[in-house]
A protein has these predicted regions:
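Single conserved hydrophobic/aromatic residue that forms the stacking wall/gate
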Residues: 1-11
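Alpha-helical transmembrane segments
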Residues: 12-23, 37-52, 112-121
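Membrane-helix interface/capping segments
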Residues: 56-79, 102-106
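Alpha-helical transmembrane segments in multipass membrane proteins, preferentially the mid-helix core
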Residues: 59-61, 120-140
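Transmembrane alpha-helical segments of multi-pass membrane proteins
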Residues: 74-94, 149-157
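Alpha-helical transmembrane segments and their membrane-interface junctions
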Residues: 93-110
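Hydrophobic, aromatic-rich membrane-embedded alpha-helical segments
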Residues: 127, 150-170
Length: 179
């Protein structure tokens, strides 16, 4: 079994931390006087930026450590699949919010932009993490160099990233069958 790392814990919370921050914000926004609403929006934005920078640093550290050999190819492949699988409910939620924004015409542009930006941020973070897995798979000779490059790029494409994560797990299992 894979030991939980800071990076995988961040991924598990990533899609839902925004919902939590927004829920707390909307609970208290009506309580605040009108002149402080702008300040509270700024605080919300600062919290989101800090959290995303933290996530970005953790993702890069995780990718580098995986590429250097902290995890075996099998462990990296399983962690990659878990990370990609956990993002699926978030993608569905963002799609629904984007669709609601699209249905709202001009008034829904904010929903639509939010859904697109959060999806792009999420796929960027999970894709960067997958690069470490691609490198580890190549170093352990489980995939060819062109295959590692192709799959590394594919980890930044919606739906293809989950399929590639499954391929990584299957290839890692073929190398070391279950004991």
């Amino acid at each position: 079994p894979i030991k939980s790392s800071a990076a995988s814990d961040v991924y598990k919370r990533q899609p839902y931390i925004y919902v939590l921050i927004l829920a707390v914000f909307f609970l208290f926004v009506d309580v605040l006087p009108e002149d402080t609403t702008d300040i509270s929006l700024l605080v919300l934005l600062i919290i989101a930026v800090i959290y995303n920078l933290y996530s970005f640093v953790i993702v890069i550290v995780n990718a580098v450590q995986t590429a250097r050999g902290k995890l075996t190819a099998g462990q990296a492949a399983r962690m990659n699949l878990i990370i990609k699988g956990i993002q699926i409910p978030a993608y569905i939620m963002h799609f629904i919010l984007g669709f609601i924004g699209l249905a709202m015409s001009v008034w829904g542009i904010g929903f639509l932009l939010w859904a697109v930006l959060i999806d792009l941020l999420t796929i960027l973070l999970t894709g960067i993490s997958s690069i470490g897995c691609s490198i580890r798979m190549r170093k352990e000779r489980l995939v060819s160099l062109p295959g590692a490059i192709f799959m590394g790029i594919g980890c930044f494409i919606y739906c293809a990233d989950v399929a590639i994560a499954i391929v990584y797990v299957v290839k890692a299992r073929k190398k070391s069958p279950a004991k």
